[in-house]
Amino acid sequence: SVRISDTITNRGDDPQEFQILYHANYGPPLLEEGAQFVGPVKKVIPFNDHASESIDSYSIYKRPTAGFTEQVYCMTPLADYDGRTTIGLVNRSKNKGISMKFSIQQLPFITLWKNTNSEGEGYVTGLEPGTNFPNNRRIERKFGRVPKLDSGQSHHAEIDFTILKGNKAVGGLIDQIQKIQRRAQPVIETKPENKD
């Protein structure tokens, strides 16, 4: 396991908005046809109309596909009783995976970036915990997703990454996520947010 611990401090005199998104990229051999994003979600929203076309399979990955146009899904995660959530990527055979654990107080949103283009063009996915979705501040302000730091105030975030080997380890991750997911039925939106 590896922990990333990050602190952002407003060293200015005036309150300041901030946005942060931790972009963790994964590719082959973990990413493959039939690989799956796993995570307990309260809500999933397609980023745009193109992503809407595949909302029913947002968590499943295709084989490398030449000319593929990226798809992005915006999620609000569920957490355990300690306020922490766990997300991950697992391969088709469910014997390899990666998990990411973090506090939803620190990082209340997840962006899932799927870019299953040809390997030469970048067959990759991003699991991205953050304070917001990947819109500009004007749009994120509209939805109340732009936090502020007062002068001298800090925002701290930690993400624990764990590499999983074997069906038992991957099965343990899936069981943990399913336990959290039992707290609420996910809402899967078929249309993107109105950004006008």
What do the PLM-derived regions correspond to, one by one?
Residues V2-T9, V90, W113, E119:
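Short beta-strand elements of extracellular/lumenal beta-sandwich folds
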